[in-house]
Regions:
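A short small-residue
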Residues: 69-77, 140-148, 174-179, 238-245
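Histidine/acidic residue-rich metal-binding segments in metalloenzymes
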Residues: 88-92, 96-100, 109-114, 136, ...
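Oxyanion-binding "anion nests"
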Residues: 124-128, 133-178
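Histidine/acidic-residue-rich, glycine-tolerant segments that coordinate divalent metal ions
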Residues: 3-126, 130-137, 217
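Zn-dependent metallopeptidase/amidohydrolase metal-coordination segment
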Residues: 208-265
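A short beta-alpha structural unit
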Residues: 123-130, 146, 175-197, 211-221, ...
Length: 266
């Protein structure tokens, strides 16, 4: 529009968005430019096209990936009692967390002696024991998990549970735990949301509040450590979901996204 803003504006094009590592690279920008607030936007299939969707407080969940390896003792398949095969320990853990794999809502619940105020879940994304060798009772096995929670402090509860479980196996197995792809809770500052939504409505943009957070994660949540933040979605209408083989970005939502940022800048 060739108009000057009374604010200094930084356009942040962040790398490595999919694994949670890129946001941390951008930390020096907040210190250098003294950022007062930050806004983010993402397209979203299967929400009404060209509508801005928002939420105060939790917008998207916190999550982290764990890779847990157990090493026991190999033996001949005819003498499994002489070895320590990790398959039973890993299978017992997989069965124990099955209720957490079935959590889909954001209501309070209790798992064993752990209490959660909202969604908390664990997804098994990989599990492997031994190899295709019918003469061996294997010594090695691993399980890989995505831990996810609406609240960061409750993601920490899930982490304590998992670590405690495998700490209890250290007399029988060598245990290794690696961490991957940590994402903070994507949290929208309620005051910033209220002010911004009023401005968007006044500018003629259609807005709608999400009834609950999105279960996926987004490393935009990291930025709330440095400034009040707000993250919204632009609906794409009915179409294949993000990351689906048939997904195609719809250019027709770009003007809505640009208009939203123009309003924010003003």
């Amino acid at each position: 529009e060739e108009k000057e803003s009374e604010y200094n504006i930084i356009y942040l094009f962040q790398p490595a968005e999919e694994n949670g590592s890129g946001a941390a690279i951008c930390k020096p920008l907040f210190e250098k430019y003294h950022v007062d607030k930050i806004f983010g936007l993402h397209n979203m299939p299967n929400l009404r096209k060209n509508v801005i969707y928002y939420r105060p407080e939790t917008v998207m969940c916190a999550s982290v990936g764990y890779r847990i390896a157990l090493t026991g003792v190999q033996s001949h398949a005819s003498e499994p009692e002489k070895g320590r095969n990790p398959v039973y320990a890993l299978s017992a853990f997989a069965k124990a967390i099955e209720p957490l794999a079935k959590q889909t809502g954001f209501q309070p619940f209790t798992f064993e002696n752990y209490h959660f105020s909202s969604l908390a879940m664990i997804t098994i994304i990989h599990m492997n024991v031994g190899s295709l060798n019918f003469g061996i009772s294997p010594a090695n096995g691993e399980i890989c998990l995505t831990l996810r929670a609406a609240k960061e402090n409750e993601l920490s509860i899930l982490e304590r549970y998992v670590r405690s479980y495998f700490e209890g196996l250290k007399e029988e197995f060598e245990v290794s735990i690696e961490e991957f792809d940590r994402f903070d809770e994507n949290y929208a500052d309620p005051s910033l949301v209220e002010k911004t939504i009023m401005k968007l409505k006044s500018a003629g943009l259609e807005v709608e509040q999400l009834s609950e957070p999105i279960r996926a994660s987004e490393d935009f949540g990291y930025y709330k450590r440095f400034a009040p933040s707000m993250f919204v979605f632009v609906g794409m209408g009915t179409c294949p979901s993000l990351h689906h083989d048939s997904y195609v970005f719809d250019d027709e939502i770009i003007p809505t996204a640009v208009h939203m940022f123009q309003v924010v800048i003003r």
